Amino acid sequence: MGRIGGPAFRYPPGYAYQRWTVGLLLPAIFLSQAYYYDGYAALGLYPPPPGSRWVRYGPDLLLVNLTTGRVEDVAYGVFL
């Protein structure tokens, strides 16, 4: 997996970095276009299955089921 620079990530008010793991529920505020990341192929990540999206959370990418908000996979430290 590659690492890239990117625009500074701004957490919504009341949120700060936390290390997400598979099975946790991501708050609904992050299940929006503002946090979706479509450049996963350039990082060597696989396409999300139907109903899921790669979501940026600080330096990490989370694969999240959009119906449940459950984290399905995590790529740590993708963004510098």
Regions found by a protein language model. Give the residues of each.
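Low-complexity segments
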Residues: 1-80
